[in-house]
Amino acid sequence: MNCKTLYYDTYGRSPDAIAFCPYRISPLGAHIDHQYGKINGFAIDKGIHIAYSAKHNGVVELQSLNFPKRAQFHIHSIPEEKVGDWADHCRGAAKMLAEKYPLRVGLSAVIEGTLPVGGLSSSASVIIAFLSALANVNGIQLGDWETIMMAKAAENKYVGVNCGKLDQSCEVLSKRDQLLYLDCRDDSYELIPRNPAMKPFRIAILFSGLERSLANSKYNLRQDECKAAAYSLMAYAGMDYASSSTPG
Protein backbone atom coordinates (compact mmCIF):
# COMPACT_ATOMS: atom_id res chain seq x y z
CA MET A 1 0.00 0.00 0.00
CA ASN A 2 1.71 3.17 -1.21
CA CYS A 3 0.11 5.48 1.35
CA LYS A 4 1.75 3.54 4.19
CA THR A 5 5.14 3.82 2.49
CA LEU A 6 4.81 7.57 1.92
CA TYR A 7 3.58 8.04 5.48
CA TYR A 8 6.68 6.28 6.81
CA ASP A 9 8.95 8.27 4.50
CA THR A 10 7.35 11.52 5.65
CA TYR A 11 7.04 10.96 9.40
CA GLY A 12 9.68 8.32 10.08
CA ARG A 13 7.20 5.85 11.54
CA SER A 14 4.28 3.69 10.53
CA PRO A 15 0.74 5.12 10.68
CA ASP A 16 -1.49 4.23 13.61
CA ALA A 17 -4.30 3.00 11.34
CA ILE A 18 -5.67 2.78 7.80
CA ALA A 19 -9.13 4.06 6.87
CA PHE A 20 -10.79 2.74 3.72
CA CYS A 21 -13.89 3.60 1.73
CA PRO A 22 -14.75 1.78 -1.51
CA TYR A 23 -15.76 3.30 -4.80
CA ARG A 24 -19.22 2.46 -6.11
CA ILE A 25 -20.94 1.42 -9.32
CA SER A 26 -24.57 2.39 -9.91
CA PRO A 27 -26.36 0.55 -12.75
CA LEU A 28 -29.44 2.74 -12.21
CA GLY A 29 -29.78 5.95 -10.27
CA ALA A 30 -27.65 8.78 -11.66
CA HIS A 31 -29.56 12.04 -11.09
CA ILE A 32 -32.43 10.05 -9.60
CA ASP A 33 -31.30 10.27 -5.98
CA HIS A 34 -31.55 14.06 -5.66
CA GLN A 35 -35.06 13.82 -7.12
CA TYR A 36 -36.05 11.35 -4.37
CA GLY A 37 -36.27 8.37 -6.69
CA LYS A 38 -35.21 4.75 -6.34
CA ILE A 39 -31.65 3.73 -7.10
CA ASN A 40 -29.44 0.69 -6.97
CA GLY A 41 -25.71 0.17 -6.76
CA PHE A 42 -22.87 -1.68 -5.11
CA ALA A 43 -19.38 -1.07 -3.80
CA ILE A 44 -16.22 -2.48 -5.38
CA ASP A 45 -12.90 -3.59 -3.93
CA LYS A 46 -11.10 -0.44 -5.10
CA GLY A 47 -11.33 2.84 -3.26
CA ILE A 48 -9.65 5.40 -1.02
CA HIS A 49 -7.08 4.42 1.60
CA ILE A 50 -5.94 6.88 4.26
CA ALA A 51 -2.88 6.11 6.38
CA TYR A 52 -3.13 8.26 9.50
CA SER A 53 -2.06 8.94 13.07
CA ALA A 54 -3.52 11.19 15.76
CA LYS A 55 -2.13 14.69 16.35
CA HIS A 56 -3.09 15.93 19.78
CA ASN A 57 -2.45 19.59 18.96
CA GLY A 58 -5.61 19.68 16.82
CA VAL A 59 -3.77 20.17 13.54
CA VAL A 60 -4.77 18.21 10.44
CA GLU A 61 -1.92 17.56 8.00
CA LEU A 62 -2.84 16.08 4.62
CA GLN A 63 -0.97 14.89 1.58
CA SER A 64 -2.18 12.87 -1.38
CA LEU A 65 -0.59 10.44 -3.77
CA ASN A 66 -3.01 11.65 -6.44
CA PHE A 67 -2.65 15.43 -6.12
CA PRO A 68 0.29 17.82 -5.65
CA LYS A 69 0.70 20.11 -2.65
CA ARG A 70 0.00 19.39 0.99
CA ALA A 71 -2.83 20.89 3.01
CA GLN A 72 -3.10 21.84 6.67
CA PHE A 73 -5.77 23.27 8.93
CA HIS A 74 -6.76 23.28 12.61
CA ILE A 75 -9.95 21.56 13.69
CA HIS A 76 -10.97 24.69 15.63
CA SER A 77 -10.39 27.09 12.73
CA ILE A 78 -11.65 25.35 9.60
CA PRO A 79 -12.13 27.90 6.78
CA GLU A 80 -15.76 28.94 6.51
CA GLU A 81 -15.68 28.62 2.73
CA LYS A 82 -13.93 26.18 0.45
CA VAL A 83 -10.36 26.96 -0.53
CA GLY A 84 -10.61 25.47 -4.01
CA ASP A 85 -8.16 22.59 -3.77
CA TRP A 86 -8.44 18.81 -3.40
CA ALA A 87 -8.46 19.03 0.40
CA ASP A 88 -11.83 20.85 0.49
CA HIS A 89 -13.52 17.46 0.81
CA CYS A 90 -11.60 16.81 4.04
CA ARG A 91 -12.23 20.32 5.35
CA GLY A 92 -15.93 19.89 4.64
CA ALA A 93 -15.98 16.54 6.41
CA ALA A 94 -14.22 18.01 9.44
CA LYS A 95 -16.60 20.96 9.53
CA MET A 96 -19.71 18.76 9.44
CA LEU A 97 -18.28 16.51 12.17
CA ALA A 98 -17.35 19.54 14.31
CA GLU A 99 -20.88 20.92 14.06
CA LYS A 100 -22.22 17.86 15.87
CA TYR A 101 -19.34 16.68 18.07
CA PRO A 102 -16.58 18.42 20.05
CA LEU A 103 -13.26 17.75 18.34
CA ARG A 104 -9.97 17.82 20.24
CA VAL A 105 -7.60 15.72 18.16
CA GLY A 106 -6.30 16.29 14.65
CA LEU A 107 -4.35 13.86 12.49
CA SER A 108 -1.54 13.47 9.99
CA ALA A 109 -2.63 11.58 6.91
CA VAL A 110 -1.59 10.33 3.50
CA ILE A 111 -4.47 9.72 1.07
CA GLU A 112 -4.34 7.27 -1.82
CA GLY A 113 -6.92 6.56 -4.50
CA THR A 114 -6.50 3.24 -6.26
CA LEU A 115 -8.16 4.33 -9.53
CA PRO A 116 -8.02 7.55 -11.61
CA VAL A 117 -9.85 10.54 -10.14
CA GLY A 118 -13.55 10.95 -10.93
CA GLY A 119 -16.32 8.74 -12.24
CA LEU A 120 -16.75 6.24 -9.41
CA SER A 121 -17.61 8.67 -6.60
CA SER A 122 -14.03 9.27 -5.45
CA SER A 123 -15.08 12.54 -3.80
CA ALA A 124 -17.63 10.80 -1.58
CA SER A 125 -15.08 8.07 -0.83
CA VAL A 126 -12.49 10.61 0.33
CA ILE A 127 -15.02 12.31 2.58
CA ILE A 128 -16.24 9.07 4.15
CA ALA A 129 -12.74 7.67 4.69
CA PHE A 130 -11.60 10.95 6.24
CA LEU A 131 -14.73 11.14 8.43
CA SER A 132 -13.94 7.65 9.67
CA ALA A 133 -10.34 8.58 10.50
CA LEU A 134 -11.14 11.89 12.22
CA ALA A 135 -14.00 10.35 14.19
CA ASN A 136 -11.75 7.49 15.27
CA VAL A 137 -8.96 9.67 16.69
CA ASN A 138 -11.60 11.65 18.60
CA GLY A 139 -13.31 8.56 20.03
CA ILE A 140 -16.52 9.17 18.07
CA GLN A 141 -18.62 6.31 16.72
CA LEU A 142 -20.74 7.22 13.72
CA GLY A 143 -23.72 5.17 12.60
CA ASP A 144 -24.25 4.28 8.95
CA TRP A 145 -26.93 6.87 8.22
CA GLU A 146 -25.14 9.49 10.28
CA THR A 147 -22.06 8.94 8.13
CA ILE A 148 -24.09 9.06 4.91
CA MET A 149 -25.87 12.30 5.74
CA MET A 150 -22.75 13.96 7.17
CA ALA A 151 -20.78 13.10 4.03
CA LYS A 152 -23.61 14.36 1.83
CA ALA A 153 -23.74 17.61 3.82
CA ALA A 154 -20.00 18.10 3.33
CA GLU A 155 -20.47 17.98 -0.45
CA ASN A 156 -23.66 20.07 -0.46
CA LYS A 157 -22.81 22.76 2.07
CA TYR A 158 -19.03 23.03 1.82
CA VAL A 159 -17.73 21.72 -1.49
CA GLY A 160 -20.77 23.11 -3.30
CA VAL A 161 -22.01 20.04 -5.15
CA ASN A 162 -25.79 19.52 -4.94
CA CYS A 163 -25.56 15.74 -4.98
CA GLY A 164 -28.06 13.29 -3.58
CA LYS A 165 -27.20 10.32 -1.38
CA LEU A 166 -26.56 7.64 -4.02
CA ASP A 167 -22.77 7.59 -3.73
CA GLN A 168 -22.57 7.72 0.04
CA SER A 169 -25.30 5.11 0.51
CA CYS A 170 -23.68 2.62 -1.85
CA GLU A 171 -20.30 3.06 -0.19
CA VAL A 172 -21.57 2.70 3.37
CA LEU A 173 -24.45 0.21 3.11
CA SER A 174 -23.26 -2.24 0.45
CA LYS A 175 -22.31 -5.83 1.25
CA ARG A 176 -20.34 -8.35 -0.76
CA ASP A 177 -22.26 -10.07 -3.59
CA GLN A 178 -25.40 -8.01 -2.91
CA LEU A 179 -27.10 -5.17 -4.76
CA LEU A 180 -28.27 -2.17 -2.76
CA TYR A 181 -31.81 -1.02 -3.58
CA LEU A 182 -32.62 2.34 -1.97
CA ASP A 183 -35.70 4.55 -1.96
CA CYS A 184 -34.28 8.07 -1.64
CA ARG A 185 -37.61 9.48 -0.50
CA ASP A 186 -37.92 7.57 2.78
CA ASP A 187 -34.42 5.98 3.00
CA SER A 188 -35.83 2.47 3.08
CA TYR A 189 -33.49 -0.03 1.49
CA GLU A 190 -32.75 -3.67 0.99
CA LEU A 191 -29.70 -5.68 0.02
CA ILE A 192 -30.58 -8.08 -2.78
CA PRO A 193 -28.40 -11.20 -2.90
CA ARG A 194 -27.22 -12.65 -6.16
CA ASN A 195 -29.60 -15.30 -7.45
CA PRO A 196 -27.85 -18.70 -7.40
CA ALA A 197 -29.45 -19.45 -10.76
CA MET A 198 -27.68 -16.53 -12.44
CA LYS A 199 -24.95 -17.38 -14.90
CA PRO A 200 -21.43 -16.19 -14.03
CA PHE A 201 -20.69 -12.64 -15.14
CA ARG A 202 -18.12 -9.90 -14.79
CA ILE A 203 -18.48 -6.13 -14.78
CA ALA A 204 -15.87 -4.12 -16.66
CA ILE A 205 -14.83 -0.63 -15.55
CA LEU A 206 -13.30 1.40 -18.38
CA PHE A 207 -11.19 4.55 -17.93
CA SER A 208 -11.93 7.13 -20.63
CA GLY A 209 -8.62 8.89 -20.12
CA LEU A 210 -10.37 11.96 -18.71
CA GLU A 211 -10.30 12.94 -15.05
CA ARG A 212 -12.93 15.22 -13.58
CA SER A 213 -14.19 16.83 -10.40
CA LEU A 214 -17.91 17.31 -9.78
CA ALA A 215 -17.18 20.65 -8.10
CA ASN A 216 -15.67 21.91 -11.38
CA SER A 217 -18.22 20.28 -13.67
CA LYS A 218 -21.77 21.11 -14.73
CA TYR A 219 -23.22 18.70 -12.16
CA ASN A 220 -25.28 21.38 -10.41
CA LEU A 221 -26.69 22.47 -13.77
CA ARG A 222 -27.75 18.88 -14.45
CA GLN A 223 -29.41 18.77 -11.05
CA ASP A 224 -31.34 21.94 -11.83
CA GLU A 225 -32.37 20.51 -15.21
CA CYS A 226 -33.65 17.33 -13.57
CA LYS A 227 -35.64 19.39 -11.08
CA ALA A 228 -37.13 21.53 -13.85
CA ALA A 229 -38.08 18.40 -15.78
CA ALA A 230 -39.72 16.94 -12.67
CA TYR A 231 -41.72 20.15 -12.13
CA SER A 232 -42.92 20.06 -15.74
CA LEU A 233 -43.90 16.40 -15.72
CA MET A 234 -45.70 16.60 -12.39
CA ALA A 235 -47.51 19.77 -13.41
CA TYR A 236 -48.62 18.03 -16.60
CA ALA A 237 -49.88 15.11 -14.51
CA GLY A 238 -51.70 17.43 -12.12
CA MET A 239 -49.48 16.52 -9.18
CA ASP A 240 -48.20 18.89 -6.49
CA TYR A 241 -44.40 18.69 -6.64
CA ALA A 242 -43.90 20.50 -3.33
CA SER A 243 -45.99 18.01 -1.39
CA SER A 244 -44.27 15.11 -3.14
CA SER A 245 -40.76 16.23 -2.20
CA THR A 246 -38.90 15.56 1.01
CA PRO A 247 -35.52 16.83 2.20
CA GLY A 248 -32.78 14.43 1.20
Where are the model-predicted features located?
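Short, charge-rich binding segments
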Residues: G41-A43, A51-A54, K100-Y101
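C-terminal nucleotide
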Residues: M1-L28, H49-D85, Q178-G248
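Conserved strand-loop elements at the edges of beta-sheets that form or border functional pockets
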Residues: F20-C21, F42-I44
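Short Gly/aromatic-enriched secondary-structure transition segments
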Residues: Y36-A43, R222-Q223
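A general secondary-structure signal for short beta-strands and their flanking turns/coil
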Residues: D45, R104, F201-I203
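Gly/Ser-rich oxyanion-binding loop with an adjacent helix/lid
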Residues: M1-I18, I25-K38, H76-S77, K82-P196
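A generic beta-sheet turn/junction motif
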Residues: A43-K46, K175
